Amino acid sequence: MKSYKIGIIGLGYVGFPLACLFAKKYPTVGYDPYQERVVRLSEGVDVTNEISTEVIQARLSTHLRCTANPNELRDCNVYIVAVPTPIDLYQQPDLTALREASSTVGSLLKQGDIVIYESTVYPGVTEEVCVPILEQTAGLTFNRDFYVGYSPERINPGDKQHTVENICKITSGSTPEIAREIDALYNSVLTGGTYLASSIKVAEAAKVIENAQRDVNIAFMNEIAKIFNILDIDTNAVIDAASSKWNFLPFRPGLVGGHCIGVDPYYLIQKAKLHGVSPRLMMEARKTNDSMGGYIAYQIINQLCLRGLPVKDSRVLLLGFTFKENCPDTRNTKVIDIYRTLQHFTDNITVYDPFANAERVAEEYGLTLTTEPAQLPTDNDVVVLCVPHQCILQTDVYQYLKPEGIIYDVKGKLPLSERIYRL
């Protein structure tokens, strides 16, 4: 039986849980170019909160080693690339990290090695972008000297129920034999099983439509929420009623941020445009979802006016800043759109999030984040429950309000009252 030594490139939300998973059975080297990240992991601290200290220490004491030195990957025979694939300022795919990772792996490749990509991309990237870099850097021939596969990540940050170990993973390979080998490798560490796709492009396409479909469905609900707000109908009550039908899909309106659903559709949109197709539904869904932060802010202003509360220089408390609940990730958070729109009316805005890193928020978004509840003002005109972290839901939100103040509940998590408004 073939013995494997696994190299994981990228130790973020995707790569590190994957490294811990493979290290249960195989010698595994986790590589990340950021020394600070490697140091914290080696100390047993995962700042993404995906893996517990106990699990990290258990893996480090057996098969796992973390490093910022790519040369320590040299003895590996399977390389798994799990680096970010964001978009640029023009909403175009940014493959910089993927190209750099491919170049790093290419400098290490040996005869018979396998390179597996997990990063979300448009169909064709693995074979048309990554493989040429591997060939050129390694001086080896694709599908003769080395092979590639694609197994798209399905990490849901903050979700302790659906983990990398117990969800079904799509696998694929550059030859039928390699595809079966990659599938067997993943199956050897997963409890949720695998789905062997017929080609790498099929696997790439499957991943990108998973997130694009969710984006479209949420956009529909956001549009519905805007309509029902005008008609003075409770959107969540409508969804609850409609959910009594067996095949109704109970998506909820809200903010769509983060590094997956709010980003990945642009990869398929760009690929479609290159081939002369204008994917209007996906593009409109993106516009709708990207508009929701500003829309919510103006809904808040409207409610302040209707209640006779001050708008100019009003005191506002935003609860939650990360892109989703129970997760420290602030990348592409749409709470910033609420904040910046409200800034046109008042400078008295406090932003609270116990999960987020205050220094990173200040550096990326230029705002001061409060992480301690004891520091929060209690005389706010409006409290906006932006991100319903469990710890926030367990507190009395009313304690932060003036007697006549209002609450805007973005995701509809609080019981309705005459002082609560929501999408």
Regions found by a protein language model. Name each.
Residues 1-423:
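Structural/interface elements that position substrates and couple domains in central-metabolism enzymes
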